[in-house]
From Swiss-Prot:
InterPro entries: PRC_barrel-like_sf, PRC_RimM, RimM, RimM_N, RimM_N_sf, Transl_B-barrel_sf. The PRC barrel domain binds ribosomal protein uS19. Coiled coil: none annotated. GO terms for molecular function: ribosome binding. SUPFAM superfamilies: PRC-barrel domain, Translation proteins. Keywords: Chaperone, Cytoplasm, Ribosome biogenesis, rRNA processing. GO terms for cellular component: cytosol; ribosome. It is found in: Cytoplasm. Binds ribosomal protein uS19. An accessory protein needed during the final step in the assembly of 30S ribosomal subunit, possibly for assembly of the head region. Essential for efficient processing of 16S rRNA. May be needed both before and after RbfA during the maturation of 16S rRNA. It has affinity for free ribosomal 30S subunits but not for 70S ribosomes. It comes from the Bacteria. This is Ribosome maturation factor RimM.
Length: 176
């Protein structure tokens, strides 16, 4: 499975730098000089699954985004060709998590959600990150519900069984 760690927003200057929107919780590691990333996007002719590999030469912060210089991208035209492309990594390349009750987002997506009594609620489609904490977006038959990812509500997660068990407060699943 591929995970998106950044998106090229636009070129910057005339020397081939690109502005990258960060989509990872560890940009210092993912975008460190010497790191190899795969870029998927409009430059590849739309071929399904194709990607071009780049080595990061330099990186610096720029207003909440990164300015990245890639080996082989030497001018504005080459940088413009990358606009809209996504930098991806393989999920298998992520380090294992040693902390209990801590998960990568992609591990939770697709899990079945049920109540403590075994009643099916739906399927996790996304983990939404907010200033107040994480929410599980759970797709139900006719709608979607956002479940706060806190111990008081999410009582257990079993990656092996593919189940997230919740103890929702009264009304959480009935909100219109």
């Amino acid at each position: 499975m591929e995970l998106v760690v950044g998106r090229v927003v636009k070129s910057h200057g005339v020397t081939g730098e690109v502005v990258v929107e960060i989509r990872t919780d560890d940009p210092a590691d993912r975008f460190a000089p010497g790191t190899r990333l795969r870029a998927k996007g409009p430059f590849d002719g739309g071929a399904e699954g194709s990607a071009v590999s780049y080595v990061i030469e330099s990186v610096r912060q720029h207003g909440g985004r990164l300015l990245v210089r890639l080996a082989g991208v030497a001018d504005r035209d080459a940088a413009d060709a990358l606009r809209g492309s996504l930098f991806v990594i393989d999920a298998d390349d992520l380090p294992p998590i040693d902390e209990p009750d801590t998960y990568y987002d992609h591990q939770l997506v697709g899990l079945m959600v049920q109540t403590a009594t075994g009643e099916g609620v739906g399927v996790v489609t996304e983990v939404v990150h907010t200033a107040a904490g994480e929410l599980l977006a759970v797709k139900r038959d006719s709608d979607e519900v956002l479940v706060p990812f806190v111990r008081a509500i999410v009582t257990s997660v079993s990656l092996d069984d593919g189940i997230v068990e919740i103890d929702p407060p009264h009304g959480l699943l009935n909100l219109e």
